[in-house]
Amino acid sequence: MQFAQKLDQLEKRFDELTQQMADPAVISDADQYRKVAKAQSELSDIAAKYREWKKVEDGLAQARPMLQEQDAELKEMAELEIAQLEPEKLRIEEELRVLLLPKDPNDDKNVVLEIRAGTGGDEATLFAAEIFRMYSRYAETQNWKMEVTSSSESSVGGLKEVIALVSGNKVYAKLKYESGVHRVQRVPVTEQQGRVHTSAITVAVLPEADEVEVKLEAKDIRIDTFCSSGPGGQSVNTTYSAVRITHLPTGLVVSCQDEKSQIKNRAKAERVLRSRLYELELEKQQAALGAERRTMVGSGDRSEKIRTYNFPQNRVSDHRIGLTLHQLDFVMEGKMDAIVDALTEFYQAQKLKQQAEKGPVS
């Protein structure tokens, strides 16, 4: 295997980190222990998979000499074992190639999820609410926490806009390919002629930035407070608990009124603002990359039409990878694994292809 030397080094590093986690000096230092545990965790899958490969390789090394045996029964046993182990070895090597791909540094981050109704009027707001419900259900299946920071309802009970913080394990890794335009094709409840209409919403998934990555300077922000309001604009309380933060250098504005506490609303608004500023920096970096590299990592362009939900045909189609599922009812209930897994595998294959063109992993 071309990259066995690389894997030997990573396995050795994994063992070193495992030993450090048992070191009393490391255990007594919470920050240091957290860093070591994180580094060890990042290598655990690779180390386990490499050991699995070595076990298979040992089995093959023992079976191959038996092909020279005069005993027909022993020879047949060796042939059967090799026939079983060779495909297993190839499968593990493919999995190792995926594990060795450069990691997206944002994959472990929480996200800011933004959904906005686009073309289609009231129907678009109803669809925005349904898509938000879809993601909420999916978050439940993943044991993620979803917190709404702000939302704007339409007169028909839909959502003009909703912004939420999603926290948990590998949130960005699983939701990062959701950014873009989502179209719905169906007969609206207000349609008298039974004609199918097309409406659209936009989804943005931003990796959440922490205070170290994006520092908010007091001189750069203006904070306004106001009374929270419900649907139709009516006041829902008499205290100035809602918060609006304006980032003066960029003009970005973030509001939060979901909590009754002004302090909690401000904290949530700051999390969203940091993530938007982080996204601006990521966009600058993306612009500096070549077009081919941007394709490999997935553009995340909000104007890109990525998916169509056709209700009459119970069909959902992802246009980027040519995926069509006639299980729209399941998907809308938050059963998104088939789509998420297919997108992940597609972009992993793209990266593997790019890696192969560069040459073997050193």
Swiss-Prot record:
Q: Name one GO molecular function term.
A: translation release factor activity, codon specific
Q: Which InterPro entries match?
A: PCRF (IPR005139), Pep_chain_release_fac_I (IPR000352), Pep_chain_release_fac_I_sf (IPR045853), Prokaryotic/Mito_RF (IPR050057), RF-1 (IPR004373)
According to the lineage, what is the superkingdom?
Answer: Bacteria
Q: Which residues form a coiled coil?
A: none
Enumerate the transmembrane spans: none
N5-methylglutamine modified-residue sites: Q234
Question: Where does this one sit in the cell?
Answer: Cytoplasm
Q: Chief subcellular site?
A: cytoplasm
Task: Summarize what the UniProt record says about post-translational modification.
Answer: Methylated by PrmC. Methylation increases the termination efficiency of RF1.
Q: Name one GO cellular component term.
A: cytoplasm
Identify the keywords attached in UniProt to this record, alphabetized: Cytoplasm, Methylation, Protein biosynthesis
Q: Which NCBIfam families match?
A: prfA, PRK00591.1
Q: What does this protein do?
A: Peptide chain release factor 1 directs the termination of translation in response to the peptide chain termination codons UAG and UAA.
The UniProt entry's sequence similarity note says: Belongs to the prokaryotic/mitochondrial release factor family.
Recorded protein name is Peptide chain release factor 1
Record organism: Solibacter usitatus (strain Ellin6076)
- The gene that this protein is the product of is prfA
